[in-house]
Amino acid sequence: DPPNPLTPYATSKACMELLGNQFRNANGLHVVFVRPFYFTGPHHSRRFVIPSIAYQLVKIKYYGAEPIIYSGSLDVSRDIIDVRDVARGMIQILNQADSGEVFNLCCGKSYTIREVVEMMVDIANVSVDFRFDPGYERRNEIPLLIGDPTKAMDIGWKPMISMEDSLTDLFNEMVKRR
């Protein structure tokens, strides 16, 4: 099915695929398309929800910050994958895929932000309250995003880093970065 982007961000990605196909067709370039879903892991920028929460937990645990996590909606669900699995997948796809192919890099399972926060609170071993902050809320938030990794798995790729390990590595890296 052709893409049907629902947000400006998704539209920009669909446009890049169109542009990539034009370059591929006009110049005979080997172009493959990778659609990584939400990814996280060590060194992820605090501008994004999961590392923002990890950073707040570091401040609570190590700096005595008030034990409150501020975030947007905790009920949106995302297919979340570790950045190292994404990097490995991109290399494998580039080396194995035919030009013009499209691959999703995802795990095929969704997690609510609430589930992720609860895992991170366990990792940090702290007690916190949650507060909704409209500054973290996105307009036109899509409540559920989940991908199908079948095509990537058909060439031998699969996510190998568990959500718990990814979040633990992110938290520990944030501790070192503090």
Model-assigned labels for residue ranges:
Residues 1-33, 40, 44:
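Catalytic helix-loop patch of NAD(P)-dependent Rossmann-fold dehydrogenases
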Residues 21-25, 54-55, 95:
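Alpha-helical segments that scaffold the active site and NAD(P)H-binding pocket
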Residues 32, 39-40, 49, 86:
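Conserved sequence/active-site signature of Rossmann-fold short-chain dehydrogenase/reductase
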Residues 38, 44, 75-78:
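Heptad-repeat alpha-helical coiled-coil signaling segments
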Residues 42-44, 48, 151:
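Short beta-loop-alpha junction of Rossmann-like oxidoreductase domains
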Residues 50-52, 147:
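Short, hinge-like loop/turn segments at secondary-structure boundaries
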Residues 57-178:
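C-terminal substrate-binding subdomain of Rossmann-fold SDR/epimerase-dehydratase oxidoreductases
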